[in-house]
C-alpha cells in the first residue's frame, strides 16, 4: 500500500501524465498502440492481434488524433505491425475499453493511461529501492530513487505506451525476489524461477529491444549474492535463472510465431517475418543501420554522448562525470577499508553490480549497433538505467 501511495504522489508531483510539462519521446512508435486501441475501441479485429495503424506511415500521429476524437475508421485500412507480439497494445486496448465506460473523451483517457503507466514505473522502481535499502541501507535507496526522479529521459519516457518502461524492470525484480526468498529460506523455491520466466516473457512480448540488457540485469542480484555467499550454490542458481530467463524469451518468440501463422496463414510466412524482423536490427538491410564498428559504438556511448543523465534545476550531470564520481567513491571506500584493516572483498559485490549495470545497456548497443548508434534516445535512456 505504501508503494502504491508513493507511486501516485511521485506521478502527481513530477507531472508525469502531462506531455506538456514533462515532455515525451518516440511518439512515432506510440502510434502503433493508439491504432490498436482505436481498433479495439470500435470492436474491430484483425488476424494475429498485432498492433498497427490506419495510415500509410507507421509513425503518422493522425492515429493518435483519431483515437482522441473517437473518429470512426474502416477495418480495411488497418495495417498490422508484425515485427513484435504487441502485448502492450492489447493490454492498453482492454484498459481503454474499461475507461471508456465512464469517460468518453479520448484525450482524457490518454492522460489517464499516461498516469497509470507512470505509476507502474514508480511502483517497480520503489520495489527496487526497497531491495537496495535492505542490502546497502536507506541512503543507497534514496540515491537510486533520485536517479529516477531527477533523470530527464525516464521522466519523459515512463508515460510512453509503446515502450512501457516499467516492464523493463520486471526481470530485475524477479531476480531480486529470488535472492530475497533464497536468503530467507536457505533454498530457492521452484516458483521463483517461474516468476523469472514470466517476467522475461512479458517484457519480450512488449518488445524485444534491449533483450540482452534485461537478461543481464535479471542476473545482477544473483551475482551480488554469489560474491558474498556460497559461490557454488549461487552459481547453480545463476545457471537455473539463466535457463528460466531464456525460456521466457523463447516462449515470447513462440507466441509471436503463432500470431504470425494466424496472420500470414502459414508457418513459412511467419518464420520469414520473424527472422526478417530480427536480422534487420543487426544487419545493413535496414535503412537505419550504419556500418559502424564495436569500438565506434562504445566511443559514442562512453565519450561522445553528453546528454544529461541527472538534472537538478540548472545543474546537470552527464555519463562521464557520473562514472568518475562512482570510481572516486569506490577508491575512498577501498582506502577506508585498508586503513581499518578490513577485507577489501566486501566491495566485490557492489563493484560487480556496478560493472554489470554499465555492461547491460552496452551489450544491446553492440548487438543492435545500428539503431543504438544513430538513435540518441536508446543511448541516453539505457545510460539512465
Regions found by a protein language model. Give the residues of each.
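Hydrophobic, aromatic-rich transmembrane alpha-helices
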Residues: 124-129, 303, 307-348
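Short hydrophobic/aromatic helix or loop-helix immediately within or flanking a transmembrane segment
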Residues: 70-111
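Membrane-lumen/periplasm interface segments of specific transmembrane helices
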Residues: 241-326
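Transmembrane alpha-helix segments characteristic
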Residues: 143-144, 342-373
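Conserved small/polar residues in nucleotide/adenosyl-binding loops
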Residues: 378-385
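Transmembrane-helix motifs of polytopic, lipid-linked glycan transferases
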Residues: 112-142
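Membrane-interface alpha helices of multi-pass inner-membrane proteins
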Residues: 191-210, 214, 244-247
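Aromatic- and kink-enriched transmembrane "portal" helix at the membrane-lumen/periplasm boundary
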Residues: 106-114, 144-170, 200-201, 205
Amino acid at each position: 500500500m505504501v508503494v502504491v501511495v508513493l507511486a501516485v504522489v511521485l506521478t502527481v508531483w513530477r507531472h508525469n501524465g502531462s506531455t506538456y510539462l514533462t515532455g515525451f519521446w518516440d511518439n512515432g512508435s506510440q502510434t502503433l498502440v493508439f491504432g490498436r486501441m482505436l481498433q479495439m475501441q470500435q470492436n474491430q479485429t484483425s488476424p494475429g492481434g498485432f498492433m498497427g495503424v490506419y495510415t500509410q506511415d507507421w509513425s503518422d500521429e493522425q492515429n493518435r488524433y483519431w483515437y482522441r476524437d473517437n473518429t470512426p475508421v474502416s477495418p480495411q485500412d488497418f495495417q498490422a505491425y508484425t515485427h513484435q507480439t504487441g502485448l502492450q497494445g492489447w493490454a492498453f486496448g482492454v484498459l481503454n475499453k474499461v475507461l471508456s465506460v465512464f469517460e468518453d473523451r479520448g484525450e482524457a483517457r490518454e492522460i489517464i493511461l499516461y498516469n497509470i503507466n507512470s505509476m507502474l514505473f514508480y511502483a517497480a522502481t520503489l520495489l527496487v529501492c526497497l531491495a537496495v535499502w535492505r542490502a546497502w541501507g536507506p541512503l543507497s535507496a534514496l540515491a537510486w530513487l533520485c536517479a529516477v526522479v531527477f533523470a530527464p529521459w525516464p521522466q519523459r519516457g515512463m508515460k510512453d505506451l509503446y515502450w512501457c518502461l516499467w516492464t523493463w524492470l520486471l526481470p530485475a525484480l524477479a531476480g531480486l525476489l529470488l535472492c530475497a526468498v533464497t536468503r530467507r529460506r536457505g533454498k530457492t523455491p521452484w516458483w521463483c524461477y517461474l516468476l523469472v520466466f514470466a517476467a522475461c516473457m512479458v517484457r519480450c512480448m512488449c518488445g524485444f529491444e534491449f533483450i540482452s540488457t534485461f537478461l543481464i540485469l535479471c542476473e545482477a542480484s544473483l551475482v551480488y549474492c554469489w560474491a558474498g555467499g556460497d559461490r557454488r550454490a549461487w552459481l547453480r542458481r545463476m545457471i537455473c535463472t539463466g535457463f528460466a530467463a531464456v525460456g521466457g524469451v523463447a516462449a515470447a518468440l513462440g507466441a509471436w510465431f503463432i500470431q504470425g501463422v494466424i496472420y500470414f496463414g502459414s508457418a513459412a510466412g511467419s518464420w520469414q517475418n520473424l527472422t526478417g524482423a530480427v536480422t534487420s536490427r543487426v544487419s545493413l538491410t535496414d535503412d537505419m543501420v550504419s556500418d559502424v564498428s564495436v569500438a565506434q559504438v562504445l566511443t559514442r556511448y562512453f565519450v561522445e554522448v553528453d546528454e544529461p543523465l541527472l538534472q537538478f534545476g540548472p545543474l546537470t550531470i552527464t555519463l562521464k562525470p557520473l562514472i568518475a564520481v562512482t570510481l572516486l567513491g569506490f577508491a575512498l571506500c577501498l582506502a577506508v577499508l585498508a586503513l581499518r584493516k578490513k577485507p577489501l572483498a566486501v566491495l566485490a559485490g557492489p563493484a560487480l553490480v556496478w560493472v554489470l549495470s554499465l555492461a547491460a545497456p552496452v551489450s544491446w548497443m553492440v548487438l543492435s549497433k545500428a539503431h543504438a548508434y544513430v538513435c540518441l534516445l536508446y543511448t541516453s535512456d539505457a545510460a539512465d538505467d
